[in-house]
């Protein structure tokens, strides 16, 4: 288990940089509506959904009901269901740790688990577990720092939630550069663009994910040859 820590930490450095900043932004926004570091800690520990927590700040500010918060968070993060489908067998082999892996499967962690290569002599399950735990700890740390520093120094939070979009863009570019097969990426861009144009920004995510899954299944034979 300990041997896998160093390569896992190295692999998660980009997420460390992004999560500290994005988590910090979340913490500042949470402090801005009157919640302190304890709230940030337990929110990031138990919810752990970047976009969902950003939405949570808006809903808390509007004094939305718990039912509204739960439904909106589910709709916003239901894309994670599709992530989990590709790791059913992998997580099952990890024993009791699979429950934490399911919980901690964020966009960035999923991206790393799909692309990272386990060094020789390192257990792949241990490395995946460390990646998930490290990413989670970065997010918690960023949020707590945001609420603490946000309470000391004044911040203008206008546009600060764009940090999440920035991180997604960086991860997409890194994955594009690390592989020769760009068909899945082009599928994703096309499906998202068409869905956005037809359904608008409030309703495009789930249909786009469904379209991407259908296209990937339909072209799995060709994609397997391209990757090989």
Regions found by a protein language model. Give the residues of each.
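Short, Lys/Arg-rich, polar N-terminal cytosolic tail immediately upstream
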Residues: 1-7
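Pore-lining transmembrane helices
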Residues: 7-102, 116, 138
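Alpha-helical transmembrane segments of multipass membrane proteins
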Residues: 24-28, 45, 55, 112, ...
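Membrane-water interface at transmembrane helix exits
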Residues: 27-31, 88, 118, 146-150, ...
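Alpha-helical transmembrane segments and their membrane-interface exit regions
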Residues: 48-51, 75-82, 167-173, 192-194, ...
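Juxtamembrane membrane-interface segments at transmembrane alpha-helix termini
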Residues: 53-58, 82-87, 173-178, 196-205, ...
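Helix-loop-helix junctions within the multi-pass membrane cores of secondary transporters/permeases
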Residues: 70-161
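Membrane-embedded alpha-helical modules
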Residues: 125-207
């Amino acid at each position: 288990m300990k041997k896998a820590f160093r390569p896992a930490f190295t692999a998660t450095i980009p997420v460390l940089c992004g999560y500290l900043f994005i988590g910090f932004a979340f913490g500042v926004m949470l402090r801005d509506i009157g919640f302190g570091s304890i709230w940030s800690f337990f929110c990031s520990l138990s919810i752990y959904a970047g976009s969902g927590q950003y939405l949570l700040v808006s809903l808390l500010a509007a004094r939305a009901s718990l039912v509204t918060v739960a439904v909106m968070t589910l709709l916003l993060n239901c894309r994670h269901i599709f992530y989990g489908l590709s790791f059913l067998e992998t997580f099952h082999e990890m024993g009791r740790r699979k429950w934490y892996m399911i919980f901690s499967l964020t966009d960035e962690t999923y991206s790393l688990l799909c692309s990272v290569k386990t060094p020789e002599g390192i257990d792949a399950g241990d490395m995946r577990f460390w990646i998930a735990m490290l990413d989670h700890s970065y997010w918690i740390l960023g949020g707590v720092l945001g609420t603490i520093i946000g309470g000391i120094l004044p911040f203008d939070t206008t546009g600060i939630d764009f940090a999440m979009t920035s991180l997604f863009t960086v991860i997409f570019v890194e994955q594009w550069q690390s592989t020769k097969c760009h068909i899945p990426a082009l599928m994703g861009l096309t499906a998202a663009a068409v869905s956005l144009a037809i359904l608008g920004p409030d309703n495009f995510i789930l249909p786009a994910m469904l379209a991407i899954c259908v296209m990937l299944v339909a072209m799995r034979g060709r994609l397997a040859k391209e990757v090989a």
